[in-house]
Amino acid sequence: MKAARFAPLGFDKSRLISRMREKGVDAILLSTPENVFYTTGYPCLPGSGNPILYALRNQFPFFSFIESDGCVTLCAWIGALLGDVEFAVDHIEMYADLKGGVETLKNFFIVKNLGGKIIGVESACPWFITALLEEHCSPMGISQIDDIMTSLRAVKSAEELAMIKKSTSIVESAIRELVEIVRPGISRPDLIQEAKIRMIANGATGIGHVTISFGTSNPELSIEENLGANQLVALDLGASYYGYLSDIRRHVYTGAVPKRLKSLHALMCGIVDEIGGGLVPGATARGLYERALSLYEKNGLVPLIINVGHSIGLMTEESWISAGSDLVLEPGMVINVELYTGYGDGVEIGNEETYLITEKRPERITTLPIPIIEI
């Protein structure tokens, strides 16, 4: 037995084979970090223990090829395959450089005799891959299979759930520590850096996001500004724990929280709780979205939403819970509910919680106290 074994945590071959048959696909070729990791265990994510395989993906791309009988082939750089390591796949194709990788794939495709077959690829599949297939294999067709992989990854295994819960606890610990240093005068870049440091110190293997805002400032960018008195601070953080992500938001206020802000926040938290309570097997994304809009209307609120949340896993927002989604909830899915409305001169106020869909009632994974913290 090898000293180090890398295996997928949630990949269900039988479910994949069934979905491939339903769609009439004979084989699939995966090239994105999330799906290669998901089907092979190859640690190519930015949140892997060593993210070098992700950083070098332009020179050493990686692929997972899965046939209709469930046979999984990993194609990867030889440098990652040397030594006392093992991957839980059926076959490995290796190469030394990008040119050799292209040649290896070409020969592999020819040996597999893909002529006249339907090959499934992701929408993000590199152009040179489809060109190789068309030039050397003459498949009957190339089909986009994002829907297959998204549906597979949506339902988490017990091992994946443990990873997501650990990632969530890491962020909650980091937020508890951050609250102690949030004070008027601190710069936003400094607070962002402190958030990263604390997530790593609490066990994160990577950073998902550090979406921190002061008042009405743009939270999506790190902007040089200093925190003032009587400002609302949004701490929206996500950690990666060996590729599995979290997404949590809590608020701090530099002063006494205005009564109207406090009551509006409590109202939004109640709406999030009500939507969270509806996360049961069989519930639809469309139905949840419509329910949220009705609650906004009932309470005289303006909705600042294009969705009511998202599933989470190897990506922060895997599938939206929106009016245009066909998602139907199943046990094992992990869903973030996040809802916001406006306050004052443009401040966004609301809440975000993470839930696990079970056979009966949803389980809230997030545990941090909800009220706005005064400092």
Residue spans for each PLM region:
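Active-site neighborhoods and metal-handling regions in enzymes and metal-associated proteins
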Residues: M1-I375
